Amino acid sequence: MVGLADPVIWHDVECGAYEADLPLWRELAAGADGPVLEIGCGTGRVALDLAGRGFDVAALDSDAALIAALAERGADLPLRAGVADARSFRLERRFALVIAPMQVVQLMGGAGGRASMLACVRDHLAPAGVFAAALADPFDGVPAEDAGPPLPDVREQDGWVFSSTPVAVRSVDGGTAIDRLRQAVSPDGQLDESMTSISLDALDAETLEGEGPAAGLRALPRRQVPATGDYVGSTIVLLEAA
């Protein structure tokens, strides 16, 4: 079905409503003396927010459909979007700030992928530029015996209702898998559903900070994004170009 197959819709459903980290990204962008690059930008939750406030933003994602949606949404903003892998991108400019929100650095496929990503980031940082990366542990939060059923992420669009509900969080080799039930209800009431999983590398702040020097990056004091009723909190690791 169209709804179940559209990555733009599901990215908007599962990521678009999160706002707890936006004040921190705005603060970091305001303190940066130059343009901002977001890697793993998706449909532009953060990039559009920053560009809408006048920041010069470039945004990359490996999914062409997500980038096409972002380019359309940001057509009138100081925003450039492109398709690229975070582990191998090459741009003709440098940035005062590079950001990786929502656990993007935990999608690199382990230490080797992170090393490639960090090298790319360092190559694109201006002198004294900063890389800011969000980390989270899906097992953090309320003890299982105290937790109620998770609420679905829901979005209505063109008469359709889309919902995505986390149904399991599993330990897997090298990380954590999050299973979600995706449901799409058409305007005439037809229900279609499918399962999807995303795997996050096990990664803590100390490990990422320890990997920085090999890429020419040194750790700055961390920042925190508090948990909300619907989302776990995150640690923002800051690495400065050495």
PLM region spans:
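Conserved class I S-adenosyl-L-methionine
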Residues: 1-42
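Class I SAM-dependent methyltransferase SAM/SAH-binding core
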Residues: 44, 48-88
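A short acidic, Gly/Pro-enriched loop at the edge of an enzyme's catalytic core
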Residues: 87-97
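A short SAM/SAH-binding and catalytic strip from SAM-dependent methyltransferases
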Residues: 96-112
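A short glycine-rich, Lys/Arg-flanked "PGG" loop and its adjoining helix->strand segment in the class I
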Residues: 115-127
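C-terminal lobe and adjacent flexible extensions of AdoMet/dcAdoMet transferase-like proteins
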Residues: 199-242
